Amino acid sequence: PDLDEVYELDLDPANPDRYLFDGTTIPIRYESITRPYRIGSTDDSLVSETQRVAVTPLGPVVYRNANKLYIVRAGPDGEYRAGSQFLAMMRARSLAEWKGALATRARATSNLTYADRAGNILTIWMGTVPRLPTRSGGDSMPIPARGSADVWTRLIALDSLPQTLNPRGGYVHNENDAPHFANLNALLDTARYPDNVERGELRLRSQHALQLIGGKDKLSLEDVLVRKHSMRMLLADRVKRDLITALKQSSPAPAVAQALAVLERWDNTVAPASRGGLLFETWWRRYQSL
């Protein structure tokens, strides 16, 4: 997620230690920060270095030139209550209490999943995501800021973050992908969310999970546990046949022919004793690097 924005401010032509904002001139504040650090891995002694940093009420200065000042304004900047928030979440005894703990907004980013004995299930894409007054500059474009109307001042509301509550089918899931496919019966529309919210992406691990739980089977807890530990490699299901065909057509050398035989016997799982799984994974990583 895009949790910060880089803003471009105009330096005061009359004083390079001030910048122009909201029609007035504001001083840049300078702080000296001393950081201890260890040199090497065997010596326990510490050395320290003091740096002078420039900061503004909008955020720290990350770059400047003769005319411009660049600052980064980050959603999680200065937040220290993540541990307290997690403790409150663990102590919650209802969905309302749990969401009340989330309202602290101390966790920079997390995919969170909830279930309770009342039958509620929820997954929420959680983040300290700014509510931007302009289109996001992403990671490559600073946004010109001449006054307060140009910079973000609050986070996107908790209830406006991508989330799925009690969907048809009785499940939610997340494998650290975007939240748009938490349930195939309740897909989230990317267009509903600002452009600094994560885009929908469904990688192989999530696709595999949906194959396991997204059907019409009625699953017991034991069934869920068995499927949770599936060793299936979905990528192999999709490309192994073509790989084998290409190898056979290449007049393989003896070593390659032996590897081909291993792949042909392989059951497309990555169980601990699966030689084919290790071989296929090694090939795929090298293939990706070409």
PLM feature segments, named:
Residues 1, 269-290:
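Structured, charged N-terminal subsegments at the starts of enzyme catalytic cores
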